[in-house]
From Swiss-Prot:
The lineage of its organism: Archaea, Methanobacteriati, Methanobacteriota, Methanomada group, Methanococci. Disulfide bonds: none annotated. InterPro entries: MJ0366-like, Ribbon_hlx_hlx. One of its GO terms (biological process) is regulation of DNA-templated transcription. Transmembrane segments: none annotated. It comes from the Archaea. SUPFAM superfamilies: Ribbon-helix-helix. It comes from Methanocaldococcus jannaschii (strain ATCC 43067 / DSM 2661 / JAL-1 / JCM 10045 / NBRC 100440). This is Uncharacterized protein MJ0366.
Length: 92
């Protein structure tokens, strides 16, 4: 008897980040994007200008898939914006 109902295809997402972070921190930032409404223009500029040297792939949960679908292609940019905000907080 096949286990079709139990074998759901897992989706992966790859992000290009300007700072090297682990999967746990990436997931944390991704979940923070769930409630994002607006982005500071200066933060956005820094995120766009930053060199994205690091590539990180994760297998998405159902919740994360919904977040990615809602944000579309802007998800990667918004993740980098969150990283910029974290860096600004660490320096202050």
């Amino acid at each position: 008897m096949p286990l079709v109902g139990f074998m759901k295809e897992k989706k992966r997402a790859t992000f290009y980040l300007y700072k090297n972070i682990d999967g746990r921190k990436l997931r944390y930032l991704l979940h923070k994007l769930e409630n994002v409404e607006n982005v500071d223009i200066d933060t956005l500029r820094r995120a766009i200008e930053a060199e994205k040297k690091y590539k990180r792939s994760i297998t998405l949960t159902e919740e994360e898939e919904v977040i990615i679908q809602r944000l579309g292609k802007s998800a990667n940019l918004l993740l980098n914006c969150e990283l910029v905000k974290l860096d600004e907080g660490e320096r202050a």
